[in-house]
């Protein structure tokens, strides 16, 4: 869990925050803003509620408020590689001449191979990408089950993000199905505003997801520094988010954890949706009964535990839009109070917003899901045709031809300036991991390995000669 020691804006910084607001009237009663007033409560422990799936209730992360500057950024690196060992320090200095072997899914039928894998020997599988193919550079994030690293693929020098998750922690939390679903869902997605999975594999102790490295920072990070977004900028960001969520729904996937921390920005300023740890595949006219998400962005039907469908994502999009336009979510307080407000309280819309912004927020933030914008037969088209999006050319937008007016400072593919120094200064050495069950049949992560096909296979066209 992220430490609760957060940099709190002082009075001068608060005044700077207020000065960029389009109207002083909306904030005149909030001159002495506290950090939690702007971004919601500090992290709390998730409570466990009995549902048909393990309850996963996140609190907001406040880890992206203090990046290193571009001027002081240094790319002086120690050559490191990834190593899986019985002692389970999986990131160690690479010793010259040392040979590493790769352990792919130990789910084969050969008992001798399974025994070797369980004894700590790593079995090399020809043509499959594994830990020995990557050189670690920096820590760029941390989650419930492990860390996220900036890595370089040795063969091509391409830069990626590698999400490393400890199996023992996953099993302790009973989250194996979530992790498998994340991997499976990522293999089915191909969209200009969604981070792509490039490779996945596993070793005895850990799971590995290798994804696009997006280094423009988080939407949350830019929102913190700008205070709030102008409507024209928020419109482009929201349109890109709507496009991404619409693609997921067309694929039969709910994201279920849409929030600024899960929306990255690329070097051109486009949004990139990430983190599918709570995503779920669904069938039309069916509901999920799990209690999951991040409290501030949960739809009322999730809080009530009455079952939810893809309409819950559109509520979260509405909360995101509200936060972009006003600087903070509509409901603040302790986790319990926020949940009560989500179910009972009306949302107050600031007067400085346009009538069109009021209309789309009211549509997305309907407490009854069947009345919510995007829940009708036309789905996302209902949102895309809303008058607030008048002027958005959706074909050009999805071709990445509509450029946001803000472009983050990025000095190159390796730049980590938009990541918090609390991560990038962190040691790349990981903590020990307990050994999983010695029974190969108990491994729930079979068929985890994946290599994304080249674009020519994903978008293959036939040519007549």
Curated annotation (Swiss-Prot):
<feature type="modified residue" description="Phosphoserine; by PDPK1">
    <location>
        <position position="290"/>
    </location>
</feature>
<dbReference type="GO" id="GO:0016301">
    <property type="term" value="F:kinase activity"/>
</dbReference>
<dbReference type="Pfam" id="PF00069">
    <property type="entry name" value="Pkinase"/>
</dbReference>
<feature type="binding site">
    <location>
        <begin position="140"/>
        <end position="148"/>
    </location>
    <ligand>
        <name>ATP</name>
    </ligand>
</feature>
<dbReference type="GO" id="GO:0004672">
    <property type="term" value="F:protein kinase activity"/>
</dbReference>
<dbReference type="InterPro" id="IPR045270">
    <property type="entry name" value="STKc_AGC"/>
</dbReference>
<dbReference type="InterPro" id="IPR011009">
    <property type="entry name" value="Kinase-like_dom_sf"/>
</dbReference>
<keyword id="KW-0067">ATP-binding</keyword>
<dbReference type="GO" id="GO:0009409">
    <property type="term" value="P:response to cold"/>
</dbReference>
<dbReference type="GO" id="GO:0005524">
    <property type="term" value="F:ATP binding"/>
</dbReference>
<keyword id="KW-0418">Kinase</keyword>
<keyword id="KW-0597">Phosphoprotein</keyword>
<feature type="region of interest" description="Activation loop">
    <location>
        <begin position="275"/>
        <end position="301"/>
    </location>
</feature>
<comment type="function">
    <text>Downstream effector of TOR signaling pathway involved in osmotic stress response. Could be involved in the control of plant growth and development. Phosphorylates the ribosomal proteins P14, P16 and S6. Functions as a repressor of cell proliferation and required for maintenance of chromosome stability and ploidy levels through the RBR1-E2F pathway. Mediates the phosphorylation of MRFs (e.g. MRF1).</text>
</comment>
<dbReference type="GO" id="GO:0008285">
    <property type="term" value="P:negative regulation of cell population proliferation"/>
</dbReference>
<feature type="active site" description="Proton acceptor">
    <location>
        <position position="257"/>
    </location>
</feature>
<dbReference type="GO" id="GO:0005737">
    <property type="term" value="C:cytoplasm"/>
</dbReference>
<feature type="modified residue" description="Phosphothreonine; by TOR">
    <location>
        <position position="449"/>
    </location>
</feature>
<dbReference type="GO" id="GO:0005634">
    <property type="term" value="C:nucleus"/>
</dbReference>
<dbReference type="GO" id="GO:0106310">
    <property type="term" value="F:protein serine kinase activity"/>
</dbReference>
<keyword id="KW-0963">Cytoplasm</keyword>
<dbReference type="InterPro" id="IPR017892">
    <property type="entry name" value="Pkinase_C"/>
</dbReference>
<protein>
    <recommendedName>
        <fullName>Serine/threonine-protein kinase AtPK1/AtPK6</fullName>
        <ecNumber>2.7.11.1</ecNumber>
    </recommendedName>
</protein>
<dbReference type="InterPro" id="IPR008271">
    <property type="entry name" value="Ser/Thr_kinase_AS"/>
</dbReference>
<dbReference type="InterPro" id="IPR017441">
    <property type="entry name" value="Protein_kinase_ATP_BS"/>
</dbReference>
<dbReference type="GO" id="GO:0009651">
    <property type="term" value="P:response to salt stress"/>
</dbReference>
<feature type="domain" description="Protein kinase">
    <location>
        <begin position="134"/>
        <end position="389"/>
    </location>
</feature>
<dbReference type="GO" id="GO:0045727">
    <property type="term" value="P:positive regulation of translation"/>
</dbReference>
<feature type="short sequence motif" description="LVxCxE motif">
    <location>
        <begin position="91"/>
        <end position="96"/>
    </location>
</feature>
<dbReference type="InterPro" id="IPR000719">
    <property type="entry name" value="Prot_kinase_dom"/>
</dbReference>
<dbReference type="GO" id="GO:0006970">
    <property type="term" value="P:response to osmotic stress"/>
</dbReference>
<dbReference type="GO" id="GO:0006468">
    <property type="term" value="P:protein phosphorylation"/>
</dbReference>
<comment type="similarity">
    <text>Belongs to the protein kinase superfamily. AGC Ser/Thr protein kinase family. S6 kinase subfamily.</text>
</comment>
<keyword id="KW-0723">Serine/threonine-protein kinase</keyword>
<keyword id="KW-0547">Nucleotide-binding</keyword>
<feature type="domain" description="AGC-kinase C-terminal">
    <location>
        <begin position="390"/>
        <end position="460"/>
    </location>
</feature>
<dbReference type="Pfam" id="PF00433">
    <property type="entry name" value="Pkinase_C"/>
</dbReference>
<dbReference type="GO" id="GO:0004674">
    <property type="term" value="F:protein serine/threonine kinase activity"/>
</dbReference>
<dbReference type="InterPro" id="IPR000961">
    <property type="entry name" value="AGC-kinase_C"/>
</dbReference>
<comment type="subunit">
    <text>Interacts with RAPTOR1. Interacts with RBR1-E2FB complex through its LVxCxE motif. Interacts with TAP46. Binds to MRF1.</text>
</comment>
<keyword id="KW-0808">Transferase</keyword>
<keyword id="KW-0539">Nucleus</keyword>
